[in-house]
A protein has these predicted regions:
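Beta-strand-rich solenoidal segments
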Residues: 49-166
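Glycine-rich, flexible loop motifs
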Residues: 1-88
Length: 166
């Protein structure tokens, strides 16, 4: 598909018009990215074949970009083993290390996004990982956690002793 200039966008390309307006949206899931248990400690995200998986990720300065599952196939993520006592709250996070720029030869710049599970801490009253913990996990995955864009796609409570998510 080509991106053209159109009077409807006040002389801007449709991509420029979208980027100028993305700030009006909150970060989070726009459509899709349904999360469901698979086998054992694995969950599947998105790829239901009918809904495009789209989310808005945000950086530390509040700048935003979209994250898409362009394969439209479910993505499997395996969670860490359950704690032996108490429960914990884990997150599944999509991140973009360096926001991709438009390219005529690379459709949606595949490979520019990481998808990771961020473990919470087991406790009698567990809480989800905070921004600092998420950015530390992004850095451990090989990206620049201090500047990456990210979006939480799923929140999963892992009960003590669980071997099969339901």
């Amino acid at each position: 598909n080509s991106v053209g200039t159109n009077a409807e966008y006040d002389g801007r390309t449709s991509v420029k018009a979208f980027n100028d307006n993305i700030g009006a949206y909150s970060s989070g899931i726009l459509s899709g990215w349904a999360c469901s248990p698979n086998t054992g400690m694995t969950v599947s995200l998105g790829g239901d074949g009918t809904t495009r998986d789209i989310a808005i990720a945000e950086d530390v300065s509040g700048n935003k970009i979209t994250v898409n599952n362009i394969s439209e196939a479910p993505i499997s993520v395996t969670m860490s083993a359950a704690p032996s006592t108490n429960s914990r709250i884990d997150l599944i996070v999509a991140y973009v290390d360096n926001p991709p720029q438009g390219s005529a030869t690379s459709i949606d710049n595949p490979g520019a996004c990481g998808l990771i599970a961020v473990d919470g801490t087991a406790a009698a009253d567990p809480v989800a990982p905070n921004d600092s913990a998420i950015r530390t996990a992004i850095t451990a995955d090989g990206a620049s956690g201090s500047t990456a864009y990210y979006v939480v796609l799923a929140t999963i409570t892992i009960a003590s002793g669980t071997t099969d998510l339901t």
